Amino acid sequence: MGELGEHRSRSSLLSIPVLDTKTSGGSEYRESDGSLDLQSTLFEDHWLQSSQATTERNTDDPEEEIPPEEMVGEELPEVSNLEDSLRRDLEVEVVGMSHLSINERTTPTTSSAKCRKKKNHRLLELAKPKFNWQCLKDRTGRCCKGHVWISPRKTNLQFCLYWPSVYWTERFIEDTTLTITVPEVSRRVEELSRPKRFYQEYYNNNRTTPIWPIPRSTLEYQASNRLKRLATPKIRNNIWSINMSEVSQVSRAAQMAVPTPRTLRLAKPRAPATLLEEWDPMPKPKPYVSDYNRLLQLATPKALSEKCVPDRSPQWEVLNVTKNAVASSRIISLAQPKIRKDLNEGYNPYYISPASLVAQASPRIYELAVPKHITKKV
């Protein structure tokens, strides 16, 4: 890397007089143009050959990458040879183009070589066939319920689920070799995995022995004093058996205390709350009750005075015209009371109007008239 930095500094120093010659005149630049073009083409060809060699090495082994230190070390002698040749040409007749222009020309070639390298690497990746995850090979596998998935680069034993990206329609191949052992299940897990119904039918049927054996270490374990104290049930006091005279003992100071008038007033019981009628500020009128004696007084007819002379006598004679009068048919019909029928008297529930008898039913009405379910007679 140090040599590459020195090479860049030398090339920059060499490019300074070239810029002065460009400003001074263009005749010498035209004369040296042909020789510089030839050298630039040779430099580009040599550069392309080195880049193609590196790409061929990458295509042979795409996974191995050459470190940048080795690449720089291989290119440094070639660059030094080019620098010596340029010095000789500049001393003789070359005063046109600097090493900086050569670098400017070679920069697109380096970028194109990198792009070409990436494209080749990508094409090699795409050219590889997709891995069949269902093929049984001597590789690290994963087993789950009789099915196996092969992992090409996994070495740690973990239960991973690998879904195939292409073979969706194919069924998983059952692992008949049984290369991976299933972990052993303890009796405790088996008992816990059984359904609740099995427990109710089997273990609740007058069973005296425990479900699973108790280990000897548990039986021989000696409980500490703290555990024994915590295991002792608490003794709760029965409040109904306590003598209340002991609880409600009044101190001597309270017995000798003299209450204030305020305390005596507060000690008196409160008067009951007033009723709703008493709270109403507007008095309501009393309900009306008729006076029976007044009714009897009003019902008694007035007594006529002896000096009262009536207009006519309350008894008078009926005329002969009235006695011989004959009632007409209209008067007789009006004199008869109205005859009222009962609720259902004269009602015919099966009466059909003549318009309904003449009506024609539409196909939709026939469709709606068909019953949904026809019950068969037993």
Curated annotation (Swiss-Prot):
Keywords: Developmental protein, Differentiation, Nucleus, Phosphoprotein, Repeat, Spermatogenesis. Residues 61-77 have a biased composition (Acidic residues). Disulfide bonds: none annotated. Signal peptide: none annotated. THEG repeats lie at residues 113-132, 179-198, 217-236, 253-272, 285-304, 321-340, 355-374. GO terms for biological process: cell differentiation; spermatogenesis. PANTHER family: TESTICULAR HAPLOID EXPRESSED GENE PROTEIN. Interacts with CCT5. May be involved (but not essential) in spermatogenesis. This is Sperm microtubule associated protein 2. The gene is Spmap2.
